A protein has these predicted regions:
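Nucleic-acid endonuclease domains
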Residues: 1-180, 197-340
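Conserved catalytic cores of phosphodiester-cleaving nucleases, focusing on short active-site segments
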Residues: 161, 185-198
Length: 340
């Protein structure tokens, strides 16, 4: 049973106990941090909690205004010299609850990878810092059609990375699209920006900032353009692709957990699968472009003082010397990763 289903099952059992105050039950995971499911009967609040040494300092003031979430920290009466961190979902919507369960399950998986209680608490806090944007925007609705298409493109390139000889953890870490970085994939010496467009839009693509195609600070910057056709049947759906990636990563626990974390913060939740299964993507064309020389782009250094947040469109009818083979791109990335 995966962690989010286990959490939902425990919540259901706690709810059926009909206790008005907060009740808790330990989650059975191999972790140095004690983790619990909680339920507050009088308000119908589902939650998770953590018990840890009172010697670990934790400031919850940055989390007091989280949308949909209530965070409390107090002395743990069940364990000596311990604190109790309680995180409760105050939104009763079923979809939001399922998403919260997925987030909690991801935390349960993640804290198993560290060897000290302090490290585990820091991991929990790190996840909480990301919740404001997630709960205020991405949990309210499913991904837009354009967001689904963009994610499909990013994950298609990600699949190429993890099917190469690249270390899978490094591959997952290089996917920085969910972090709102200028490019979708970035490491110390290379970056790849992915643009996924439908056939009727080719050859024009939208560039979202003056930094997106600015290669000034990196050794190699590539633009990967995927042209897709949207079909009611045939082709591959976004959930299909994600299931393939999960299967590839299944033997690498840390990489798999990191991938799930990034999926969540990209706004993808399994509870919305039925919506995403309505769109099938058939890949019509793929091209890679090395961003250099006469490749059409705006660079930050060319802007007048005070100009920023530039969005513009380019045509990919570019000189042939900018087009490179996929094998060239992957081999370059692998050579850089091997030399770091």
């Amino acid at each position: 049973m995966n962690s989010d289903n286990m959490i939902k099952d425990i919540w259901k059992e706690l709810e059926e106990a009909h206790v008005p105050s907060v009740v808790k039950r330990a989650i059975d995971i191999p972790s140095c941090l004690k983790m619990f499911c909680t339920y507050k009967g009088q308000d119908g609040y589902y939650g998770i909690a953590f018990s840890f040494s009172e010697g670990i300092n934790l400031d919850i003031s940055p989390f007091q205004n989280l949308s949909e979430i209530e965070v409390s920290l107090f002395k743990d009466s069940s364990f000596p010299d311990s604190k109790f961190l309680l995180i409760q979902l105050v939104n009763r919507d079923c979809r939001v609850r399922d998403i919260f369960a997925a987030i909690c399950g991801n935390i349960a998986n993640t804290i198993q990878s560290v060897s000290s209680e302090r490290e585990a608490v820091l991991l929990v806090v790190s996840q909480m810092r990301k919740w404001q944007d997630l709960f205020s925007k991405k949990m309210k609705t499913t991904l837009s059609v354009q967001e689904q298409q963009g994610l499909f493109g990013e994950l298609s390139f990600f699949q190429k990375l993890i099917c190469s000889s690249m270390d899978k953890v490094h591959a997952v870490k290089s996917w920085v699209g969910p972090n709102m970085n200028p490019q979708d994939f970035q490491s110390e010496l290379w970056a790849v920006e992915v643009k996924t467009i439908t056939a009727n839009k080719f050859p024009n693509v939208l560039i979202n900032s003056e930094l997106q195609l600015d290669e000034s600070t990196i050794s190699k910057l590539y633009l990967y353009n995927m042209v897709v056709e949207i079909l009611p049947v045939d082709g591959k759906t976004l959930p299909d692709l994600i299931d393939e990636l999960r299967d590839i990563l299944s033997q690498e626990t840390y990489a798999a957990n990191l991938f799930e974390n990034k999926l969540l913060y990209s706004g993808y939740f399994d509870t919305d699968k039925d919506v995403y299964n309505e769109r099938h993507y058939y890949i019509r064309k793929e091209n890679y472009y090395l961003v250099q020389g006469e490749f059409p782009r705006i660079k930050k250094e060319n802007l007048l003082l005070g100009v920023s947040n530039v969005k513009y469109s380019i045509s990919l009818a570019v000189p042939t010397e900018n087009i490179v083979e996929e094998s060239n791109v992957l081999n370059t990335i692998l050579s850089y990763e091997g030399n770091q």
